[in-house]
Amino acid sequence: MAALLMPRRNKGMRTRLGCLSHKSDSCSDFTAILPDKPNRALKRLSTEEATRWADSFDVLLSHKYGVAAFRAFLKTEFSEENLEFWLACEEFKKTRSTAKLVTKAHRIFEEFVDVQAPREVNIDFQTREATRKNMQEPSLTCFDQAQGKVHSLMEKDSYPRFLRSKMYLDLLSQSQRRLS
């Protein structure tokens, strides 16, 4: 059964990667990077929703298509690790099992926070060391300081570039054309 599904999944991935392999200002078919079924997703995305993403970074992060669009933009800049870390922290905070909490905490630390981590986020030494210390007794708040720094970095750096990007402007244009 899985083998039968593989070609469809690969085709979708090729479409997404094809769009992402270009620079961020050359990707105008935004539907390729939205989650789920792209055409239906774009039809459900209103101009008002996409415009609201410019209201604040937190508004963007609260909308699943906003996160998908921002992730696609960050991939074009090879800097999606910050968003992936932020999302992993948000998911981590929902953990209720103590055993799972410890396992997830170590996985997040090793993936994003540790020096030379595979997807190391850009945080200062003090924040990294405070987070390392928090790992001695992981809790739901052990990544709060690092997550806050990463959020601030994305908000001040990546988010303004996203709002000016051809990718975002094309998305707005496409959603407005649907209204016409």
From Swiss-Prot:
Disulfide bonds: none
Free-text function comment from the UniProt entry: Regulates G protein-coupled receptor signaling cascades, including signaling via muscarinic acetylcholine receptor CHRM2 and dopamine receptor DRD2. Inhibits signal transduction by increasing the GTPase activity of G protein alpha subunits, thereby driving them into their inactive GDP-bound form. Modulates the activity of potassium channels that are activated in response to DRD2 and CHRM2 signaling.
Molecular function, one GO term: GTPase activator activity
A GO BP entry: regulation of dopamine receptor signaling pathway
Subcellular location: Cell membrane; Membrane; Perikaryon; Cell projection, Dendrite
Sorted UniProt keywords: Cell membrane, Cell projection, Membrane, Nucleus, Phosphoprotein, Signal transduction inhibitor
PROSITE patterns per UniProt: RGS
Superkingdom of the organism of origin: Eukaryota
Free-text tissue specificity from the UniProt record: Expressed at high levels in brain. Very little expression detected in other tissues. Detected in Purkinje cells in the cerebellum.
Organism from which the protein derives: Rattus norvegicus (Rat)
CDD domains the UniProt entry points to: RGS_RGS8
PANTHER family: REGULATOR OF G PROTEIN SIGNALING (PTHR10845), REGULATOR OF G-PROTEIN SIGNALING 8 (PTHR10845:SF147)
Chief location: membrane
InterPro entries: RGS (IPR016137), RGS_RGS8 (IPR034949), RGS_sf (IPR036305), RGS_subdom1/3 (IPR024066), RGS_subdomain_2 (IPR044926)
Name of protein: Regulator of G-protein signaling 8
Alphabetized Pfam families for the sequence: RGS (PF00615)
Protein topology in the membrane: Peripheral membrane protein
